[in-house]
C-alpha cells in the first residue's frame, strides 16, 4: 500500500542484508554485515545511466576495537556525503570472496547460541523465523550485574541507538540494548562465558 501512495519509496534494508529485493528500490549495508569499511548494494528496477565516482576510502583490517573506532569515524564521514559512489575495488573483491551461504548459516548459529544462554537475562523476547538471517542479537540485559560484567571486560559493545532522546517512551529500552554481533564466533563465546 505504501508503494502505491508514495511512488518514489526506497526501502532501507541496512539491517537486512539477506532480504531479497521485492521490486521496490532498496539498499542494504555491506559494512554492517561484513568486515569492510564502505559500501552498499542499491537495487532498483530502473536502469541507471549515470556513472558514479569510485569511493576511495581504504581502511586496513585491524583489531575489533580499532575497526569499531574507524567505523564510527567513517559513519560521520558518510553522513556528510550526499552523493552515491561506486564501492571501491578492494571492497568489491572482498565481497566477491564471501561465501554468503556459509555466512548466513554462521549468523543463525551464533544467534541461537546467544538465545540459548541469554534469553533468561534479556528484556527482549525473540523469535527467529525460518529463513531469517539476523544482523545482530539485540540484548537488553535485565540485570545491573550483567550490565556491569559486560562493560567491565573492555569488549566492543555496539549500541545502535545510543543516547536516544529521553523524551521518547522507547529511550530506556533503546539506550540499554546492545547489538551483539553475529559474525565472530570467538567474540560470542567470550560474551557467553562472561554471563555464565
Where are each of the predicted segments found?
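Catalytic PLP-binding core of fold-type I/II PLP enzymes
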Residues: 1-23
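Active-site PLP attachment segment
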Residues: 23-63
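Active-site C-terminal subdomain of aminotransferase-like
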Residues: 47-91
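Short, conserved charged micro-motifs
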Residues: 50, 142-150, 186-191
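Conserved glycine-rich beta-strand-loop-beta hairpin in the small C-terminal domain of fold type I
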Residues: 87-115, 124-140
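Conserved PLP cofactor-binding pocket of PLP-dependent enzymes
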Residues: 128-139, 143-178
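PLP-dependent enzyme catalytic core of the Aspartate aminotransferase-like
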Residues: 166-196
